[in-house]
Amino acid sequence: MINLFYAYQPLLDFFLLNAGFALSQYIVLRAGVFSIATVGIVSVGAYFAAIVMKNYGLSIWLVAPAAAVVGLAIGLLLSIPLARLRGPYQAIATLAFVQIVAAIALYAEPLTGGALGMNDIPKQVSTLGLLLALAIVLYILGSLSSTRVGHIFDALRQDEAVAGSLGISITFHHALAFALSGAIAALFGALQAGYIYSIEPHQYGFAMLAMTLAAVILGGRRSIWGPIVGAAIMTFLPEIARPLAENRLLLNGLLLIVVIIFLPRGVVDGLIEVARRRRRPAASAPVGEKAASEVRA
């Protein structure tokens, strides 16, 4: 049993990292912000940690919280120019940010190592450390979900105009979502750098962007467990489907299409909704009205 655990420990570690990235993406989508800046901020956190650890010899457990603060600041700064943008325009603007970060990582060779990246980063992150970091983030987001802020995020996602008419500061709460997302992304980016020995610019490109978005879409964006389940699917399914060789990507795509068609809210949120309907057939109020009433309270 122990040998089996050690055999699959690297896969578990990558799941924990992917879950952290997915939670960062989840928080902005839950607040109704179509941001895909997570990958860019993950890259910033990873390079920040790698540079500080290699040049100054600091422990990852000092560097990772500092990276989270850097990510929080980037999230706040991003929220300022994006305050007037909505929907696909937010997505395009944040994609531009990701490209800018990738260009800096690629061409600032004296600092980042350029296309070759940074190697020989001290490995100071274990499975237990990743579990602890994920547990802390889950606790914070879980506590937030049951507060007024969590209800406001739901109201903003469902109907921003109605939320604004209730006196909710849309700009402030979007900035808060960006800040939380940035802190989580940079934190797990730093932990990734302290785990995998080396980082390269291409690691933080379209593949990671697609993975984080797919994890939230598959799992759902209303419950904090949605991104966790989505990250598990995106991490473990390719390994389970390894005998299919290159057809594994086809399986991932088909699964995503099936979930979008039959469970448009995601696996977790969809199953929760089905369970609620069975318990309360037709008497419950519409979701938007429920969120609005919770915000008023």
Question: What annotation goes with each model-predicted range?
Answer:
Residues M1-A297:
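Transmembrane alpha-helices and adjacent helix-loop boundaries
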